[in-house]
Amino acid sequence: MGELRRSPLHERHVELGAKTAAFGGWEMPIEYAGRGVLAEHAAVRGAVGIFDVSHLGKARVAGPGAAEFVNTCLTNDLRRVGPGQAQYTLCCDETGGVVDDLIAYYYAVDNVFLVPNAANTAEVVRRLAAQAPAGVAVTDLHTEFAVLAVQGPAAPEVLRKLGLPADGAYMSFADAEWKGRPVIVCRSGYTGEAGFELLPRWADAVPLWDELLTVVTGLGGLPCGLGARDTLRTEMGYPLHGQDLSLSISPVQARSGWAVGWDKPAFWGREALLAERAAGPARSLWGLRSNDRGIPRPHMRVSGPDGAELGEVTSGTFSPTLRQGIGLALLDRSVTAGDEVAVDVRGRVSTMTVVRPPFVSASPR
């Protein structure tokens, strides 16, 4: 692996005593000194938290027919949304495997802004650029914009205190200004709570972070790292690319078919996904709730009461809200909700119940 890239807020994280780790080729904060993941998680569920997720990619597809072109490539149907609306979508290969899951911001028929995952940005840009018609440009803007996520019940109040738009519908976005500086504001997130993702220019990230952090902490909130982001998204059953979605785990298997425009005449992987949907997937993503002290972790083996192997855990953690182990697992088509399964937790058998996520109730809208 080459040298890790850093967020424009790296020095701020160091000042806050952040524990950092590699994630998608970036050095990012996992948790902050003095509190830890459990406190950061609780802050988001009960008040508000601020995350630096500037490692996320950014790209723009622009030119005559740009939106129509994107719609023939990515799975979801951009015709379902209009200008000022964002949409969760997938970039698949010809086998139906998931190259990435990402957010498409629909600006206009000739302008679509994309936010892929950090490690997959270059590949998404490469694939789109290779197929782009004459006049349509695909531009990698990875370090042109930072991304700050403000998440939790008090998130709208935080934005109002900064004079930023806070009343938009879920998955709507707007070009706004903060102290004369441009910032994209989207009503979205990865936690299950009310929240916003703010995209300032890279050079404007530090002053915006500083003011946001002051307001957030004044409302009883905390800066939060990727550790809490992972526990929050797992409680909601949101998939993480590379674990619950991948080149070998299709949208049909991962229950992400809602993000596929099945009636569209074209998108990458269409034929393979239609065939898999018609036949029924051989395995599907389920939730697991521990019945003892066992905590599921990725790649742990899952078996039935008779010892037959049923699949493996793809994501797992201790749920700070439920105070028990929870996880996501890719399991055989014979499995159904309510089944009890055995998970090999470091050589010890832990009994878990198969459930359909989310594990907790939340209100992202």
Curated annotation (Swiss-Prot):
Catalytic activity: N(6)-[(R)-S(8)-aminomethyldihydrolipoyl]-L-lysyl-[protein] + (6S)-5,6,7,8-tetrahydrofolate = N(6)-[(R)-dihydrolipoyl]-L-lysyl-[protein] + (6R)-5,10-methylene-5,6,7,8-tetrahydrofolate + NH4(+)
GO process terms (BP): glycine decarboxylation via glycine cleavage system
Any one GO molecular-function label of the UniProt entry: transaminase activity
Pfam assignment, any one: GCV_T_C
Domain of life: Bacteria
EC identifiers of the protein: 2.1.2.10
Keywords: Aminotransferase, Transferase
SUPFAM superfamilies: Aminomethyltransferase beta-barrel domain (SSF101790), Folate-binding domain (SSF103025)
GO CC, alphabetical: cytosol; glycine cleavage complex
Assembly information from the UniProt record: The glycine cleavage system is composed of four proteins: P, T, L and H.
Entry similarity comment: Belongs to the GcvT family.
Record's function text: The glycine cleavage system catalyzes the degradation of glycine.
Annotated protein name in UniProt: Aminomethyltransferase
Species the sequence originates in: Parafrankia sp. (strain EAN1pec)
Lineage: Bacteria, Bacillati, Actinomycetota, Actinomycetes, Frankiales
Gene that this polypeptide is encoded by: gcvT
